[in-house]
Curated annotation (Swiss-Prot):
One of its GO terms (biological process) is dUMP biosynthetic process. It comes from Pseudomonas putida (strain GB-1). Its EC number is 3.6.1.23. Keywords: Hydrolase, Magnesium, Metal-binding, Nucleotide metabolism. This is Deoxyuridine 5'-triphosphate nucleotidohydrolase.
């Protein structure tokens, strides 16, 4: 298991609310919680930037983290990430914030301490560009957006 440096920015984290943990031994994501001042209603169509009370420092340029939605919130309540996926670079050290968007037609209350997203570490391969005049031909070529078939 990889060790991450973390700072607790909200004293409720680790006392009133548990630190991010894996729910099961096979879980890929650490649950992030809404460290709001009070329960907050997210109106239909509204987005809100929610603090997690935590900052991390990955430090390894071969790793990054992504913030992903929790499937139950999206499927059952229409609460998804406002930016779809949050990317945390290895050199970022600020608070982890979660952009939540209510895509439903119903107001949704985000409770203080509620699990709102998950953090997943991913490997990173950095690349540089080799400028060429033409590519070697491939079967697909420049075909995209449904080019490989409709079903």
């Amino acid at each position: 298991m990889h060790a991450l440096q973390a700072k607790i920015l909200d004293p409720r984290l680790g006392s009133e609310f548990p630190l991010p943990t894996y729910a099961t031994p096979g879980s890929a994501g650490l649950d992030l919680r809404a460290l709001l001042k009070e329960d907050t209603v997210l109106e239909p169509g509204q987005t809100l930037l929610i603090p997690t009370g935590l900052s991390i420092y990955i430090g390894d340029p071969g790793l990054a983290a992504v913030i992903l939605p929790r499937s139950g919130l999206g499927h059952k309540h229409g609460i998804v990430l406002g930016n779809l996926v949050g990317l945390i670079d290895s050199d970022y050290q600020g608070e982890l914030m979660v952009s939540c968007w209510n895509r439903s037609n119903t107001p949704f209350t985000i409770a203080v301490g509620e699990r709102i997203a998950q953090l997943v570490l991913v490997p990173v391969v950095q690349a540089h560009f080799d400028i060429v005049e033409a590519f070697d031909e491939s079967q697909r070529g420049a075909g995209g957006f449904g080019h490989s078939g409709s079903h």
